Amino acid sequence: GGVMLMKRHDTVSECVICFFFLFSSFTQTVEHGFPNQPSALAYDPKLQLMAIGTKSGAIKIYGAPGVEMTGLHKDTAAVTQIHFLYGQGRILSLLDDNTIHLWEIVQRENRSHLVEVHSFNLPGKPGIESTSATRVTVMLLKLSCELLALGTEGGGVLLFVKSFTCLVIPLFSVPEEYKCGKSLGPVESLQEHPQDSDKILIGYSRGLVVLWDLNCRHVDNLFLGKQQLESLVWERSGNSFVSSHSDGGYMVWAVSSSNPCTHDPISSTIPYGPFPCKAVNKILWRTTESGLLFSGGMPRASYGDRHCLTILQDSSHVTLDFTSRVIDFFTIHCTDREKEFDDPSALVVLLEEELVVIDLQMAGWPTVPAPYLAPLHSSAVTCSCHISNVPPKLWERVVSNWPICGGKNLAADPKQKELLLTGHEDGTVRFWDASGVSLKPLYKLSTANIFQTDCEHNDSLTQAGEEEWPPFRKVGCFDPYSDDPRLAIQKISVCKYSGKLVVAGTAGQVIVLVLSDEKSDHMIDVATVDLLQDREGFTWKGHDRLPPKSGSVVFAPGFQPVVLVQCMPPAAVTAVTLHAEWNLIAFGTSHGFGLFDYHRRKSFAFFHRCTLHPNDSLAMEGPLSRVKSLKKSLRQSFRRIRKSRVSGKKRVVVQEANAQLAEHDAEVTPVQRRIEPRSADDSLSGVVRCLCFADTFLRDGTHHGPTMWAGTNSGSVYAYALDVPSQEKFSEQSVEALLGKEIQLMHRAPVVSIAVLDGRGNPLPEPYEVSRDLAKAPDMQGSHSVLIVSEEQFKVFMLPKVSAKTKFKLTAHEGCRVRKVALSNFTSVSSEEYSENALVCLTNLGDIHVFSVPALRPQVHYDCIRKEDISGIASCLFTKTGQGFYLISPSEYERFSLSARVITEPLCRVDVERPHDLSAHR
């Protein structure tokens, strides 16, 4: 017996090793979305690469779509400035701990990576008085990369040449009132002369500006500004420069060798005066015939809270009004010194919550949609849904040149198109192209327009009137304030073959939408379903339903709503599923579930069931209610009333599904800790956690047909046999549902997922896949089984008898719970023809387990998300090809792959020519 046992053990081990090598490997592949808390921006016009630094110490480089690289400083200090060494593929970063770091783009395995190669500690840590004078406020890297100039808080300028040898600029021939070092204030700006690289402009906080000759080491010109300085910029000829100030104004200064000491500027303007204005933090002067760009400067009293950037060109004047703070901006323009004008083509603005690009060549200066860095959180993400292998027909129905185009994307075109759908707090669903490294926005669907909400958007608010001053123009899409939290999307289900979509929200709204290429003006049918039926003694204390608009509504081409199913009470929808071939949707809340035939919506073909336990008083409070809990006595009186009512009714015989697997203590393996049964008194036991449709054997072993399955928070599973009329009779007959089985898991753990497997143990194909020859027909000869996943264990039951076949308890760790599961298909690395299905599971500890199906053998196990990252775990989503996404911040998805074959990661190259003498830059 011992030998046999060993052999079996070896076989299992071999199975696991085989799976690991052929199918599985865990890789965190790419971060999609917008970096959390950006703090610095740089652009290399030669390589056409953009770099963003963040408060957590990350540096991210972006070029053409697909060209992305990320580096992370060892210490999590904020990146305060970043500068490219022009054309060299190197970056200098300054952190707020007063350290400077040199990064290099290096080639490894024929692709580019960003690597830190050197770091340099400057004297002076923050918060220590004696050294705060040496704290760096501004950096200038000369275009030739031969010299680095650092301005400090104490007013000093340090020059670093080869090997970081330090020189200090002495302040000779400065007027008496500026002589005392501290009274100059910190260095605010250092700018290289655009025509003579041996000269730099030094701007001090108190207003003094010095033109310094680096070769002769003396002052060429002094400009005696009296207003507190914020920023300096040269005009490209070098004959003049502009200074911007804390009073909201800017000044133009002439540079003349015949006048070494200039007291007054040529002109001085406060564009948004005369009342006190906020500082102009940064200004750019770009010549076409004329052109200025600056951030800030708003009238303090009336618009002091606005985040603005102004574009001035002759008589054209636009105040770009953003919803988050301007971090930095640059223009893409001609850098050839010989040319007369800058002729900027685009303005790139990094904001705290998004990246906005303005086309400066087109009339009206429109925004350019970005192919990456999408602000996923323009309204908070509330749910998500992934569609792999999107058919071309759907793709073509839901899909401008991007100016930042450095590097080469080496990744082959993806073999199949993938869509990521995100539901948001404002009632929108956004469609993203998730086929490659860049998560690209494709389409936005809004559901708010079918309801009467308190805050109807007024167009007059978004566009400035002709007479309005300043001439504001709302730009960007970050809008964190939802008009009505009830609009938030909770669940999404989509049929990629028929172009049908179901979205469900926070106030019990379930909306069926159909993809249309034509504009439409129609009324939406509304069907109301009372999930409490005739239950007495329950009063909903939560929010009201969203009132639908009366009359017809105009809908643009795209997904258009055809019917609104309103659950009553209007609690958040907790589960939804769609079967487009049968014209059915199923939906669930904390009170029950319903089945709806949307094809026969005129006669409202409904079936519904209440899942409320007699003592589910908490389910009546609603997520937006202020009521936290009911007094115990009230709950007990509810229980007494309900017990007397329920006990008198005849009930379907509940199968104790665990009875056949009633285990003895001796059989409990160390990995599978004993599960404690839960009491039916646990709050919210009636919440419907999952729903599924399947064509399988429920009534007997010879006749298969449509079924619907529902699982609840208290470990109940309901299975219904459905009579679905044939296609020809859809209009005449309605669907009928008959309760076939009711299963109660003994440990009463919430049911996370239900899936029916065919005779070979494979998941059933999606609707339309078989009828359109897109998938093999399922095995209807062998006996089917149902996989039921609860928070504590997996079980496979044979159908139609619902006899237990196999199980696995995932509770080795105290408090370990299943959070997300999916059936994924893993294709072999060695052969595309060979693939295996597996059950992928994420726990509340953040680790991922992969199990064989239907045997439920553990295959591999990976640490993925920190267990403290509750929102990351809650947002995790698995794809059918073994990839996954989870939010690492409100604005970024981390993408990962469990498949050794299907990996979406940056594969790019940046070709650079560097001078041989690297010591000059080390």
Predicted regions and their residues:
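Non-catalytic interaction/regulatory modules that flank or connect domains
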Residues: S268-H377, A580, H591-G592, L698, ...
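Extended amphipathic alpha-helical scaffold segments
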Residues: Q313-H317, D321, T331-E338, D342, ...
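Intrinsically disordered terminal extensions that flank WD40 beta-propeller domains
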Residues: G1-P35, A346-V348
